[in-house]
């Protein structure tokens, strides 16, 4: 978060701030960033914020009183919501993209704007990219085009806070609210305009780039020391070696799934996939098993069964059900764990030791079929500086294989599920809802 806030604070009126967010919670993390965005907008920086309309739970991202207060104190912030639902029944089509653009710099990766990503609960990976957004061949230009495509799509709606005080709010109907609370609007207005205490938030864990690891020297993404200056270590990479990918708002083909399959086809020696959710759709599983048969070493690093099950037992059950088949196909499956008991949430792919993907794509049916995703492919030249090799090494080092040297599972998946909490009825429930996992 420190890097994002520094970019926002340095932004000038000649630049733009554009944010795609799957989750933007008004907790300590999101609240801190929002107040910095308000300051930027009040000094003339144009800010556009597009948030998925559902989030991790069935609710809209900002309460109406906050939207009204934002409109009053910082009209330069434009807020739109992706695909909100009035009945909250159909919630399968989600904007899972994560993109943070300020001028000629972007932050891309797995991280959402909430405490879970910045307070030592999830292990994330992001990358900062700088270039010429005005150059059509640049990845920065492609990122801005992606944002504009979503911002102007039919799947997006614009709240109209100037009307909220006169009519019932369409964003609160499902919660049974008919009018807004003037006292609540006043609270949010005062909160948004309260002075930011630089010293206070410099030592706040939410202000750090990533959760502090138990061993900062071990984790390449460990947070800098409190109060450290923002000075990224840039690694020059030729424009043609960066390829930005994303889905269309309506999730049409070809999209990120097809891009991933094409990348796997090029693998000659090794594919490493680091992803919290390994519930492979048939196309992905077939591609990986085929590459394994062709002599390509396929390594899958997952979040632990216990952490997946804690989030949603059906997901843990589906993963456990797939383990025997993956291991029998010769694929090396590993599970991440660290001393802080964080859930791995990073999304990385490494092909043949030099071609990386970093982004939002999960290896499950939601990312493959339903959710919109984005990411950056990076082709590292021979003997070139590599910004992600330490991250891949970290996740491999902090994971253990689920099978022995002879390719046999070390523990029975059913027994592991019973211990983790995804046994019993979850076997049958998972069979019914698997295509939505």
What role is predicted for each listed range?
Residues 139, 280, 384:
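Short phosphate-engaging motifs
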Residues 18, 48-50, 80, 272, ...:
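A structural signal for isolated positions on well-ordered beta-strands in alpha/beta enzyme cores
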Residues 259, 263-293, 297-314:
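Long, K/E/R/D-enriched contiguous segments that form extended
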Residues 268-271, 292-295, 327-333, 352-353, ...:
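Alpha-helix capping/termination and helix-coil
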Residues 19, 153-160, 273, 401-405:
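Intrinsically disordered or highly flexible coil/loop and linker segments, enriched in small
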Residues 18, 148-151, 272, 393:
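Structural signal for well-ordered, non-membrane alpha-helices
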Residues 1-15, 23-266, 306-354, 361, ...:
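HKD-type phospholipase D/PLD-like phosphodiesterase module
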